[in-house]
Each structure stands twice: as C-alpha cells, then as structure tokens.
Amino acid sequence: SPSIAAMTKLFDLTPAEARLATLLAAGQSVEDIAANLELSRETIRNRLKAVLAKTGTHRQAELVALMSRL
C-alpha cells in the first residue's frame, strides 16, 4: 500500500487521515485503531468519513480496494 506521504499528496489527506487509511488497508479494525492511537471510536469514524469523501469511496471496503491498487 502507498506511504502516508503519498496518500497525503494523492488525495489531500491530513497525516492523521492518511495514517488511518494505511492502517485500515493493513487490515486493522476501527476499534483496534482507536485503542492503539488512544482515540475514541467516534473520532476514528469521523476521520474515516473524511477519508472516504476525499478518496471518492463510499465504504471502508472500497477504500481498502482502492489502496490495494495504488
């Protein structure tokens, strides 16, 4: 999958959004990511909504598929 730096440039993601996208592409769940980053699930879900909007995807599975093609 692409690097965090590449994701920020390709889709105008913030570093936090790009990190979330790469962790999801690596197979981590929203719950695991929230726990590991010591953030609430709601914060992670809000970031995910922003990532989906910026990448033109509508579901987490679409985002992971997109990232696997990059």
List PLM regions with ranges.
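Short helix-to-turn junction characteristic of helix-turn-helix DNA-binding domains
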Residues: 24-28, 67
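Short, basic, alpha-helical segments at the C-terminal edge of helix-turn-helix-like DNA-binding modules
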Residues: 60-70
